[in-house]
């Protein structure tokens, strides 16, 4: 693999050349040219990617690292799992060659096959220690396997061909690895929002895909969010923006970047030509688009002070993910409502789902949302059978904290959460912030009492005053009948049998001795034994029984467990929720349309 200098004949100080030639082996070939290496040049590959808080050990996919100077081999010493030292002549260019296996379809790493290639710089581009702030370049080289492919990336093009292969530049290493690259045969569309050119590429869509609808709806989201952050007429922080969507049979997720986002969704989630009304999957996709785009401001510019400068070698801890992910989660669906893509009923259904997810998580009473933020590295991204019992999602509970703060500020009559977000943007000049900064702006926008409430919501495990605050803004709460799994304290998977995935703390299933991994085979009630294949069968065969026997399979043994549902199998009716009684399943409806409209449409308090 040989790369060429740019048109000026001058190669940037740090130059990467990437080629997708061995597509059937899923291998990217990479060459790193260092114009002025140190005598003992250190190199490392990040262990994590910003925005996804888990040590992922990207170096496990790197192989065959070699170094040369003037065509001659140079000694390479591996110092750790992700670090190498090159014994260089500091007066000559150093060329490092290696391959990276790309076999992860997620948005976090890299993928390569005959159809498409994708990578984040954190998976392919070594960090040249001591030279991170120097200009970097990425050259994408074509190959016989990629001759009809196109390229999409947020990197600045310097010298590229019609398909996008060629030379791109970045001001420094952080910028280089914050601009993922999509390659392949894909659908491409564009629009302008807030004066900023936007591009949308979609790989893997079915022929029925309605690209024009996706573009039109995405444009509405972008225009609404730009208007939100730049109500004062200031310019957005990016010159252009790229959406990269990988469409597969069944997956979902996204990762934010400074002027782009990588997304993944299921084919059935896309809008279809001739379809008058898209399904819930499409609304979920629009929520994802809204979420990642909002991160352009809230995470990529506004960010935790602890992450002002990334340490790519280890975990970067912060207690503020409730703000950066949770508040973004509050606004993602809210902007679908403000942009006219959801009606009030659809939006409240999404809010209801979030509330119930939190209320049905025993871990909310064990760990605060600030603690959950700090523990993201070992808990949120490493979920297991006990996760629901000992932690809470900083996405979902964080979004409810944002909801409560917005409603509390509006009830106070002076401001709202929109003012807080824009105030933080102004006072930080779109840079790092601390919790103290958030509290100070809340105090200024509302009063110190509301700031104190926010601090308590974030650092305690008390339930949030959701019903009281919603009621003050025209939203009535009602207690909804719980599903059987919720009544029993179970989370299950049904596939011709009942597989127990989680046993929730304090529930009837835990008291009976059930555990994650059990297969629930049968129930015995009133002297009759019944085989079950789905959880509803329990209610079918044992309704009205105050005690029943559950037969479960565990480690090839059949166990007999006594379950005391205590009338939980009986059907229940909905009832109004008063603010004093604990509720684990909530429904919402509008009781005062004018008050609700002021909140849902973003009218100032």
Which residues does each PLM region occupy?
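C-terminal recognition in membrane/secretory proteostasis and scaffolding
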Residues: 332, 342-605
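Early extracytoplasmic/domain-onset interaction patches
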Residues: 2-48
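N-terminal, post-signal-peptide region of Sec/Tat-exported proteins
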Residues: 37-67
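Juxtacatalytic substrate-recognition/specificity segment
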Residues: 190-321
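Post-HExxH zinc-binding segment in Zn-dependent metallohydrolases
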Residues: 261-268, 301-302, 313-364, 551
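Soluble non-cytosolic domains of exported or imported proteins
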Residues: 132, 208-220, 279-280, 284, ...
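Non-catalytic architectural context of zinc metalloproteases
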Residues: 4, 56-64, 68, 72-220, ...
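Intrinsic-disorder/low-complexity, polar/charged segments enriched in Ser/Thr/Lys/Arg/Asp/Glu/Gln
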Residues: 13-15, 27-31, 40-42, 93-95, ...
């Amino acid at each position: 693999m040989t790369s060429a200098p740019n048109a000026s004949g001058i190669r940037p100080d740090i130059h990467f050349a990437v080629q997708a030639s061995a597509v059937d082996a899923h291998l990217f070939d990479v060459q790193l040219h260092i114009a002025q290496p140190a005598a003992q040049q250190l190199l490392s590959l990040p262990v994590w990617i910003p925005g996804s808080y888990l040590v992922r050990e990207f170096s496990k996919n790197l192989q065959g690292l070699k170094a040369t100077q003037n065509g001659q081999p140079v000694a390479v010493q591996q110092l750790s799992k992700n670090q190498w030292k090159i014994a260089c002549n500091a007066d000559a260019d150093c060329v490092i060659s290696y391959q990276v296996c790309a076999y992860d379809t997620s948005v976090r790493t890299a993928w390569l096959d005959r159809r498409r290639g994708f990578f984040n710089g954190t998976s392919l581009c070594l960090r040249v220690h001591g030279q991170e702030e120097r200009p970097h370049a990425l050259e994408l080289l074509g190959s016989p396997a990629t001759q009809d492919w196109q390229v999409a990336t947020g990197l600045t093009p310097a010298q590229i061909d019609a398909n996008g292969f060629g030379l791109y530049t970045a001001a420094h290493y952080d910028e280089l690895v914050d601009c993922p690259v999509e390659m392949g045969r894909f659908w491409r569309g564009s629009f302008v929002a807030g004066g900023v050119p936007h591009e949308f590429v979609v790989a893997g869509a079915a022929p029925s895909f309605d690209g024009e609808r996706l573009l039109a709806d995405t444009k509405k989201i972008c225009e609404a969010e730009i208007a939100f952050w730049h109500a004062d007429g200031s310019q957005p922080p990016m010159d252009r923006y790229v959406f990269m969507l990988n469409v597969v049979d069944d997956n979902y997720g996204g990762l934010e970047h400074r002027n782009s986002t990588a997304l993944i969704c299921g084919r059935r989630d896309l809008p279809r030509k001739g379809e008058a009304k898209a399904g819930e999957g499409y609304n979920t996709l629009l929520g994802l688009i809204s979420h990642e785009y909002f991160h352009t401001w809230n995470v990529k510019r506004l960010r935790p002070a602890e992450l002002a400068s990334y340490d790519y070698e280890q975990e970067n801890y912060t207690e503020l993910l409730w703000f950066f992910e949770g508040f973004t989660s509050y606004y993602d669906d809210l902007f679908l409502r403000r942009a006219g893509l959801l009606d009030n009923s659809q939006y409240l259904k999404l809010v209801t789902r979030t509330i119930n997810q939190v209320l049905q998580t025993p871990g909310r009473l064990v760990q605060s949302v600030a603690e959950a933020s700090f523990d993201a590295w070992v808990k949120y991204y490493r979920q297991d059978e006990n996760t629901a019992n000992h932690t809470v999602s900083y996405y979902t509970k964080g979004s409810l904290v944002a909801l409560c703060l917005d409603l509390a500020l509006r009830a106070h009559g002076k401001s709202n959460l929109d003012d807080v977000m824009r105030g933080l943007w102004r006072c930080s000049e779109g840079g790092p912030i601390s919790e103290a900064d958030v509290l100070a702006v809340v105090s200024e926008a509302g009063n110190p009492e509301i700031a104190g409430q926010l601090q308590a919501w974030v650092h305690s495990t008390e339930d949030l005053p959701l019903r009281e605050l919603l009621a003050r803004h025209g939203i009535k709460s009602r207690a909804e009948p719980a599903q059987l799994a919720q009544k029993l304290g179970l989370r299950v998977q049904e596939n011709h049998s009942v597989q127990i995935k989680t046993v929730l703390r304090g529930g009837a299933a835990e008291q009976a001795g059930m555990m994650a991994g059990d297969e629930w085979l049968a129930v015995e009630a009133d002297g009759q034994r019944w085989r079950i294949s789905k959880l509803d069968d329990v209610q079918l065969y044992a309704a009205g029984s105050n005690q029943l026997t559950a037969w479960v399979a565990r480690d090839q043994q059949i166990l007999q467990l006594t379950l005391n549902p205590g009338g939980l199998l009986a059907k229940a009716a909905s009832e109004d929720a008063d603010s004093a009684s604990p509720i684990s399943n909530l429904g919402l409806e509008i009781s005062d349309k004018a008050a609700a409209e002021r909140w849902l449409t973003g009218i100032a308090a």
